[in-house]
Amino acid sequence: MPTLRPYTPPDAPACLALFDTNVPRYFGPHERHDFANYLLHPDRAHDYLVIEHNGHVVACGGLALDNEHTAAFCWGMVDNAQHRQGLGKQLSHARLAHAKALGAQRVTLSTSQHTQDFYAGLGFAVTHITPDGHGAGLDAVEMVLELAPR
């Protein structure tokens, strides 16, 4: 059974391998350096999680509290060979629960046209689209989910 747990620095190689399985459809190759830097120099304002299954990291993703009322999803991904098995939903629901626990009233994210329907299914709404905003062929789709007040 997949297990959700906090990211630790020894997870970095596995998370980078997940990233590589999602290039070029979901991430541009130029983004790898930024992701590696993020993993190696974690910001205490960000919470990063991994999902482990059968001893392997199969998904990872973070949540950053941008201000008192807004949180943002960051660097979320699932091993390309494991898409459509519920791991993305598990990871997203965990991050949403954490955002609510932190008192966030909304969650934002920047994704691409390839995953915007997934996030729409979780209740996120598109606020802006920038063609090729994440690189050639990867539109930047900005989305927001308003959370119910606690």
Predicted regions located by residue number:
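Conserved acetyl-CoA-binding loop-helix of GNAT-fold acetyltransferases
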Residues: V78, R84-A97
